[in-house]
Amino acid sequence: MDINQNLGNLMKEAQKMQQRMQEAQQQLSQLVVSGESGGGMVTIKMNGRHDVTEVKIKPTLMDEDIEMLEDLIAAAVNDAVRKIEKASKEKISQLTAGLNIPTDLMGDKEGE
């Protein structure tokens, strides 16, 4: 292949990737996950845009130490964020599976 053909193929792959990324962003924005802490004492619902849409606190926690409640809320939010990030990575992996993109261009630094 000559360089023009390589560039043409690269542009086609980039266009496919852009379209797939837009589709993935749309799908991920509709995703809703639940993060929890304290064995379900605090539950947070978060969408794919990282917006917290619901907070549930067991009534028995309202009589507890406020610092513990704050810690449980933070832990539940962090749990939800981790779930969103995992779902996002899985979706991106699915999208890039059929494309001829070098893996070092994907910014995956888990192996480092």
From Swiss-Prot:
* A Pfam family this chain is assigned to: YbaB_DNA_bd
Annotated compartments: Cytoplasm, Nucleoid
Q: List the disulfide bonds.
A: none
> GO MF annotations for this entry?
DNA binding
Q: Name one GO cellular component term.
A: bacterial nucleoid
Task: Write the record's keywords in alphabetical order, separated by commas.
Answer: Cytoplasm, DNA-binding
Q: Which InterPro entries match?
A: YbaB-like_sf (IPR036894), YbaB/EbfC (IPR004401)
Q: What does the subunit section of this Swiss-Prot or TrEMBL entry state?
A: Homodimer.
| Physiological role | Binds to DNA and alters its conformation. May be involved in regulation of gene expression, nucleoid organization and DNA protection.
Family assignment from sequence similarity: Belongs to the YbaB/EbfC family.
Q: What name does this protein carry?
A: Nucleoid-associated protein lpg2755
The record lists the organism as Legionella pneumophila subsp. pneumophila (strain Philadelphia 1 / ATCC 33152 / DSM 7513)
